[in-house]
Amino acid sequence: KIDPLDFFCRLSKSNLAPEAFLIKDKNYSVISCSPETLIEKKGRSILTKPIAGTLKKNNKLNKNKALQYFRKNIKETKEHNMIVDMERSDLSRICVPGSVKIKKEKTVEEYKDLFHYVSLIKGKLNEKAKTIDIVKSMMPGGSVIGCPKISTLNLLNKQEKENRNIYTGSFGYIKFNGDMRFNIIIRSILNFKNTSEISVASGVVIDSNANHEF
């Protein structure tokens, strides 16, 4: 049996993540150390920070050599570029034409056990874009679906035998002024009275190696 608050506090100390959260209800709890920002909207400015491309830390390699290997990895680069293109396209549907820009491209973020490729994409919302338009355009996040999004979703619905539940969904808030922030629910535990559920996945492209992904 898990004490949600205690577990979340210990998890936050050992694996701090920018989009971590805890939901505690009498029937269930969600404990998450998600690192990924899907939507951050302030006024007419909107951004997304897709994460795609991962390297597990290796005690045999120092940090500099590990990063050199990471940056030369064609598969991880292709995966990240694909997701960046898709998220840029999603933003373009709701933003002023020409305003969507990649502000930071393929920077490396370091976590306790991993390195990730992260990009920052920003745009200026068009005047007609409403909250529902933003949600429809950006959700579900591209990094947990793949490209092209709609056909991939249809394929996943046929192939996946069980519903993902909260996994790869989003958690966040919408303010009264329309500002919002949402993450992508990964690295999370869905905890019930007597059971706990953890979902995992990997991004697969043509250059993927099954053993490496596992």
Predicted regions and their residues:
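Extended alpha-helical targeting/anchoring segments
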Residues: 1-214
